[in-house]
Regions:
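Feature marking well-ordered beta-strand scaffolds used for ligand recognition
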Residues: 1-217
Length: 217
């Protein structure tokens, strides 16, 4: 049986000095850039779930996970249940101080997973890294993760129209957490969450597009 087309596709690269990490839908590879510029493979981590976008901050690697097959234990068997305590969608954090043997040291569950993320600050004097997270997948069942509401718009608590602000303590990444989930598409005057394009077309023979309820990148 053939694997899906994108199962092993590379999705992103991150650099730090002579270190290169290449993320994919199936995990990531670590490399050391040699004097001639050619990368030498040091390690491979199998951890399916896409999206595979990666960032390096010191000895920590931050990785985006979006697909519903992702597991907390990085297992290959995936998850078929609609609701499961084993599912992981969000931000994984790895200690890459030993590039040949990265170790997962933190994981932050989010309602829509993580299609991409941006490291916006840190670590500062408080020893914390701040990450903006954007999920573009479906909103998971609230039975699986409390507070995940997919009403559009309908409910001001909806997980749509938002990003996640994630705080990562460098000395204890296992305590990484979401500190805010602002509605970035809200109208500041009316408070309407879906203040941008609400879906539809622009008249006869024009393209029909979906409601703007997410940040892709």
């Amino acid at each position: 049986e053939r694997s899906p087309l994108l199962s092993f596709s590379n999705t992103d690269m991150a650099f730090a000095g002579d270190v290169l990490v290449a993320g994919s839908y199936h995990g990531f590879n670590t490399y050391r850039l040699q004097d001639d510029g050619v990368p030498a493979l040091l390690g491979s981590v199998v951890c399916p779930g896409g999206q595979g976008d990666v960032s390096i901050v010191g000895d920590l690697l931050i990785m985006s996970v979006e697909q519903t097959r992702g597991r907390l234990d990085c297992g290959l068997q995936g998850i078929s249940d609609d609701v499961s305590t084993d599912r992981f969608r969000g931000i994984r954090i790895f200690d890459i101080s030993d590039l040949a043997r990265p170790v997962q040291v933190g994981a932050v569950q989010t309602c829509r997973g993580s299609h991409t993320h941006s490291v916006v600050s840190g670590p500062g004097a408080d020893g914390k890294i701040i990450v903006y997270n954007s999920g573009t997948s479906s909103v998971r069942d609230e039975e699986e993760l409390e507070g995940c509401i997919g009403e559009s718009p309908g409910d001001d608590r909806t997980a749509l129209f938002r990003i996640d602000v994630i705080e990562i303590p460098v000395d204890d990444p296992g305590k990484a957490r979401i500190v805010d989930s602002p509605a970035v598409f809200a109208d500041p005057e009316s408070g309407v969450l879906g203040a941008l394009w609400r879906g539809g077309d622009h008249g006869d023979e024009t393209q029909e597009t979906s409601q703007t309820d997410q940040c892709h990148d």
